[in-house]
UniProtKB/Swiss-Prot annotation:
Pfam family, one: Methyltransf_5
GO cellular component labels: cytoplasm
The encoding gene: rsmH
Domain of life from the UniProt record: Bacteria
EC numbers for this chain: 2.1.1.199
Subcellular localization(s) per the UniProt record: Cytoplasm
Protein family: Belongs to the methyltransferase superfamily. RsmH family.
Species for this entry: Polynucleobacter necessarius subsp. necessarius (strain STIR1)
The protein's role, per its UniProt record: Specifically methylates the N4 position of cytidine in position 1402 (C1402) of 16S rRNA.
Protein name: Ribosomal RNA small subunit methyltransferase H
An annotated Gene Ontology molecular function: rRNA (cytosine-N4-)-methyltransferase activity
Residues where S-adenosyl-L-methionine binds: G42, G43, H44, D62, F86, D104, Q111
Top EC class of this enzyme: transferase
Length: 316
């Protein structure tokens, strides 16, 4: 099934990176290198390629083999496709060699809409949830072996679900009866039988599915590693743009950027402001989708993009 995917904050992300001092002043003698951390269906990658000169290069990462198959159809010698997590990007580029990095942390519409991927509680399919279907346990396999405490922890921590214990207890009870959830709709029905209250506009299974997806794919661990790798790879003057879709991701991005945008000076030390060392990052902007974009693409409504620039002359 060919399901269209609309990249979120497309124009804003391109402007954020291309508007940085390095790419803005690109010429044929500059060796411009840009990284797109998640190819998805190529919207951001292809839009950025249009803004780069013929001698530029781009590396796009994705853990999803379906995304890699789409990416390999792009006939552009400037583009290198890597089947790996952006958390490993520092294995594919030299330190301080990259002019711009984009991390779009959302899952793509095909991943949600294709039932066999197991991401959607609205579509009957195997309870898989893996981005990389060649690696790791499926959500169903993990739920069959995890303890009550482990399931509770995952749903509470990554889904911020207040009924985490009750949901975990129901899963374990079904498992003990020889009926562990194997499909998306089985799990969604089980959660709905426990979570009696509904948040406005949200299915009772939303938080549980989010939690399992984040855990199975190590999304927050990858984000933390990816941010550290980005700091290592960015040239002074290069920009980092990160699009997040829920509070757990955005909190990590916000705290990371803020931590690198300040200078720790011992309290009481008599140092004039002009003599303070520079911070590693300068925070550029925080953007949300316009009302028009959300109207056209409701999945964009929770997106937040944070942009920062590595200071010239500052250490990582």
């Amino acid at each position: 099934m060919n399901i269209a995917h609309r990249p979120v904050l497309l124009a804003e992300a391109v402007t954020a990176l291309v508007g940085g001092p390095l790419i803005q002043n690109q010429n044929s003698e500059n060796h411009i290198l840009v990284i797109d951390g998640t190819f998805g269906r190529g919207g951001h990658t292809q839009a950025l390629l249009k803004e780069l000169n013929p001698s530029a290069h781009m590396i796009s990462f994705d853990k999803d083999l379906d995304a890699i198959a789409v990416a390999q159809k792009i006939n552009d010698p400037r583009l290198k496709i890597v089947h790996d997590s952006f958390a490993q990007m520092d294995q594919y580029a030299e330190a301080e060699s990259v002019d711009g990095i984009l991390l779009d942390l959302g899952i793509s519409s095909p991943q949600v809409d294709e039932a066999h991927r197991g991401f959607s509680f609205r579509r009957e399919g195997p309870l898989d949830m893996r981005m990389n279907t060649d690696h790791g346990l499926t959500a169903a396999e993990w739920l069959e072996q995890a303890s009550l405490e482990e399931i509770t922890h995952v749903i509470k921590t990554y889904g911020e679900e207040r009924f985490a214990f009750q949901i975990a207890r129901a899963i374990v009870a079904k498992r003990e009866d020889g009926l562990p959830p194997k499909t998306t709709t089985q799990l969604a029905s089980l959660v709905s039988s426990v979570v009696r209250t509904r948040e406005a506009g949200q299915d009772p299974a939303t938080r549980t599915f989010q939690a399992l997806r984040i855990f199975i794919n190590r999304e927050l661990e990858d984000l933390e590693l990816g941010l550290k790798a980005a700091m290592k790879l960015l040239k002074p003057g290069a920009r980092l743009a990160v699009i997040s879709f829920h509070s757990l991701e955005d909190r990590i991005v916000k705290q990371f950027m803020q931590a690198h945008a300040k200078v720790d000076v011992p309290r009481g030390l008599p140092v004039r402001e002009k003599d303070l060392p520079q911070s590693a990052l300068k925070i550029i902007s925080r953007l949300k989708p316009s009302d028009a974009e959300v109207s056209e693409n409701p999945r964009a409504r929770s997106a937040i993009m944070r942009v920062a620039e590595k200071r010239i002359g500052a250490a990582s």
